[in-house]
């Protein structure tokens, strides 16, 4: 990797949520979170701090090699297939 713990801590600080679920995460519990490539390596992404986000373990394992947008689209399909309705499109905000 082309970054280290200090780089990651400087970017995300002491308190940070999962970039996908919004769950609060804790540096002191490494089982709570995983580093994720925003653009997966398999899709041409690089191993730099700018291509890094932190996800809760469950979200990262479910996301796998998908991009965030592909994963969100998959989640929408699952929700709809299970009989739930999305009452309005979920708009992406400026903050994420």
Model feature map: region roles:
Residues 27, 52-74, 79:
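Short Cys/His-centered divalent metal-binding micro-motifs
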Residues 1-20:
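Short, charged surface segments at domain edges that flank catalytic/cofactor-binding sites
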Residues 20-21, 75:
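Conserved short hydrophobic patches within well-ordered secondary structure
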Residues 46-62, 81-96:
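Short Fe-S-cluster ligation motifs
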Residues 7, 41, 60:
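Generic anion/oxyanion-binding catalytic loop in active/binding sites
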Residues 22-54, 63:
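Histidine-centered nuclease catalytic patch
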Residues 3-5, 35, 49, 68:
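Structural motif detector for alpha-helix initiation sites
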């Amino acid at each position: 990797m082309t970054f280290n713990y200090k780089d990651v801590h400087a970017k995300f600080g002491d308190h940070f949520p999962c970039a996908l679920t919004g769950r609060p995460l804790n540096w002191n519990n490494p089982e709570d979170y995983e580093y994720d490539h925003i653009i997966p390596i398999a899709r041409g992404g690089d191993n730099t701090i700018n291509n890094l986000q932190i996800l809760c373990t469950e979200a990262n394992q479910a996301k796998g090699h998908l991009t965030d947008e592909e994963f969100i689209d998959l989640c929408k399909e699952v929700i709809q297939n299970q009989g739930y309705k999305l009452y309005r499109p979920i708009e992406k905000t400026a903050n994420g």
